[in-house]
């Protein structure tokens, strides 16, 4: 029995070594993924213990007009722009973007990428809903909500799913990009959109800042964990790489 257990761990260690040998940059991804999930755990502890509440209130009120707490800080066009930004993380648009992207990937014979995208988004959606039900944290009541809400606040579903969807699409596009600068640009755009969605949720008063921070962390960690898993399965020849032309 001991020998069997030893062989299992030995085989896993050898596979992990080969994985890191062929994909050295994945080591950094694993470390980053561990950091993201650990930081998320710290945020959860702070929220459950109430340690984040004072800072949450302070940041939320900083974004409101001091003379009229009913209105967000800044001109009317900024509020309208924030509503547009928050829509980028809405379930309707994300579903449309995911479906359209998956159909395109299937059309150009990038089947593995299509199912990779659908798997990350589907499991992310389930996880987001389960966490909202489990934590059941009330949304801010200090200011009026400038956007319609349906579920509890923690973590921010818009921030979580925007990070998952756009970061996953960014990595798929980056894989086909011929230049490193273009890869960095695509990933940067994905991160920028996710950050913008999260900021808009706090600005509109529908989430505490800690809700949004948690959404970013778990969303990035979830997308990154799936990417690492995919690379590992490719190395083990469990998944076959798509033969796709690079994007020029």
Predicted regions: what is each one?
Residues 1-92, 139-145:
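N-terminal transmembrane-helix/juxtamembrane module of multi-pass inner/ER membrane proteins
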Residues 3-4, 140-248:
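Membrane-embedded catalytic cores of phosphoryl/pyrophosphoryl-handling enzymes
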Residues 13, 80, 97-103, 170, ...:
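Hydrophobic, membrane-inserted alpha-helices
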Residues 14-22, 76-83, 105, 109, ...:
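Membrane-helix interfacial "entry" motifs
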Residues 33-37, 124-128, 196-197, 222-227:
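Alpha-helical transmembrane segments of multipass membrane proteins
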Residues 37-46, 127-136, 200:
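C-terminal TM-helix exit segments that contain a strictly Trp-centered aromatic cap at the helix terminus
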Residues 43, 58, 118, 130-134, ...:
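Membrane-spanning helices that line or support transport/gating and their immediate boundary helices
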Residues 53-67, 96-180, 184-188:
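Membrane-interface loops
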